[in-house]
Amino acid sequence: MKAIILAAGYATRLYPLTLHTPKALLPIGKKPIIDHIVEKMNTVKELDAIYVVSNDKFAEQFADWAKTAKSHVPITVLNDGTTDDSNKRGAIGDISFVIDEMQIADDLMVIAGDNFFTYSLKEYVDFFHEKNRDCVCVKVWEDEAAL
C-alpha cells in the first residue's frame, strides 16, 4: 500500500499566516499537522511508501521536513511544478500526477495534508480489507451550528 499526502495548495485564504509556510507544516501543539498524519500512518503495517505532493513554492520546505520526519517508511516529496493558484492541478490532478510519476499500481491511501484527525488509520485500513472495496472517510456533524 502506498500513501499520498496532498500538500500542493497555496492556502491563500489563510494569508498572511501561510504566505511563507504551507498549511501542512503549520503546528498543532508542538508539531506540524503533517507529523500528526505520518504518526497515524506509522500504525499501518501494509504501508511501504509515502508520497507528499507539493508545489514549486513549498516543495523545498517539504523536502527539508522529510529529512527528519519520523516515518517507518520512505517519504518522497514530489514537486507538481505549479507556481500559483492560477495553474495548480487540484486534488485529482495531483493524485493522477503522483500515480503516473511513481507508476503506482497498488492500494492507495490519500489524505489531505492540512487535515487534523483523531481516528485510527490502522482500523480504517482493516475496514478496507474487510469490505474489499474502495473506501472514503467522512465526518458527519450532528450539530450544523458547530460547523
At which residue positions do the language-model features occur?
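Conserved core of the sugar-phosphate nucleotidyltransferase
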Residues: T118-L147
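Conserved beta-strand scaffold positions in the cores of enzyme catalytic domains, especially
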Residues: L25, V77, D134-V136
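Active-site glycine-rich loops that stabilize anionic/oxyanionic intermediates
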Residues: Y10
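Short beta-strand segments
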Residues: L6-A7, V110-A112, C137-V140
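Short alpha-helical oligomerization interface
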Residues: L19-K23
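Conserved N-terminal catalytic core of the sugar/cofactor nucleotidyltransferase
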Residues: K2-I5, R13, P27, K31-V110, ...
